[in-house]
Amino acid sequence: MSMKWTSALLLIQLSCYFSSGSCGKVLVWPTEFSHWMNIKTILDELVQRGHEVTVLASSASISFDPNSPSTLKFEVYPVSLTKTEFEDIIKQLVKRWAELPKDTFWSYFSQVQEIMWTFNDILRKFCKDIVSNKKLMKKLQESRFDVVLADAVFPFGELLAELLKIPFVYSLRFSPGYAIEKHSGGLLFPPSYVPVVMSELSDQMTFIERVKNMIYVLYFEFWFQIFDMKKWDQFYSEVLGRPTTLSETMAKADIWLIRNYWDFQFPHPLLPNVEFVGGLHCKPAKPLPKEMEEFVQSSGENGVVVFSLGSMVSNTSEERANVIASALAKIPQKVLWRFDGNKPDTLGLNTRLYKWIPQNDLLGHPKTRAFITHGGANGIYEAIYHGIPMVGVPLFADQPDNIAHMKAKGAAVSLDFHTMSSTDLLNALKTVINDPLYKENAMKLSRIHHDQPVKPLDRAVFWIEFVMRHKGAKHLRVAAHDLTWFQYHSLDVTGFLLACVATVIFIITKCLFCVWKFVRTGKKGKRD
């Protein structure tokens, strides 16, 4: 009997091992807003597969409440800011970025860098609060986590993994100029055919556009810095007790989960430890709330238009709101507008305002004809998933670039949010709704997205489990990470070969000169 029980317990353990990646323990360094939405989708799936997931959350976290019921565990660390103060700072920085004039390239990106550094100063204080919290660090050490999951644009996840001596996996949408992807991930982005992110170019560039792209590349390479590297390098060196850099620590990532895919991104080279998981949060539409469904059905054959500027922009100016409402009032479609502000005076009877909308469910509704979007990656992927053409009104960050990608693929029309007129918006809506080519292109992208051997979410979870099972994935990291910059570009080899060629040429020249001198001397002797 005891043998049978032993066998049964062994089978249960083996079942746990194979079905849920050894039932591992995952520590998460989270992000806010839409970044959290993507991470949480992965975390929920990990929990479903039997893993224990712990989120390291600050007491000022905005996007999640550690006290609400959840299948996730939260380890809360105290910070000097309150949730309200932190949220106000974020909103002010976002508002400032969204309203930046693009008069000159240099001025715009200098101010963007300043905004990013301001946020990173706050983040670095949070990080210092963690490492100085001996009780918390001891608890994390004793928890024996198997892997750290972090977003690469929010530093510290990699330092946490280094301190706990465990592997780590990155989730990343993009970094300005692909700086993180290139310097820490080792990815290649040839400027001749890959437009640098935030350039708003496509992969079909003219000569002048390639010149522009090269200028962007050089600027991001030698001037623009996402992080104040001196401060981060000093902080990491102090914590680890040895000279190091943020970039060097980030380069130790085992797997990079890039929230992109070829339905969205232009083709470029990849590496073995980089996996595209764009649209992992997308899912089939669920039924709408009764009142909303009745409004949608009342649209008849004309259908509906969905309008949202995302979660980070709560409202807009009264003047802009009236411009938009005036255009929406002139279309035959019904409109569901996510809007948190005073009701515009020009609002038409065909338009309803909502503080929140089930965006994915609306985009998946058969009566949806178009999506007016600020160009956030999550919203665009939901539109791709359901095959909905877009009118893009980008505001900041990667949004102009995202809309440029969709425009290049024939699935969107782009407008300038700050300067567009009612006529501009009206014409754009008529174009994407009435021109069948936009719907066809959107459906083509949708078919590409759905035609994958493994779903993006399953790929993401597989690689996290893979890292836990194998205690890392160092065998997938290219040796380029171990080379200096001059070795990587083969400058030492090139210099050596040039020296060899120069030496050979010198020796041959010297020999020829000696032969010539000898012959000349011989001829002169015969004459004498």
UniProtKB/Swiss-Prot annotation:
Glycosylation sites: N315
The protein's name: UDP-glucuronosyltransferase 2B4
Organism field: Homo sapiens
Keyword Phosphoprotein set for record: no
Gene3D superfamilies assigned to the protein according to its UniProt record, in alphabetical order: Glycogen Phosphorylase B
Keyword annotations from UniProtKB, A to Z: Endoplasmic reticulum, Glycoprotein, Glycosyltransferase, Lipid metabolism, Membrane, Signal, Transferase, Transmembrane, Transmembrane helix
Family per similarity comment: Belongs to the UDP-glycosyltransferase family.
Gene: UGT2B4
Membrane-related topology note: Single-pass membrane protein
Coiled coil: none
Membrane spanning stretches: 493-509
InterPro entries according to UniProt: UDP-glycosyltransferase, UDP_glucos_trans, UDP_glycos_trans_CS
Domain of life per record: Eukaryota
Residues in the signal sequence: 1-23
GO biological process terms on file: estrogen metabolic process; xenobiotic metabolic process
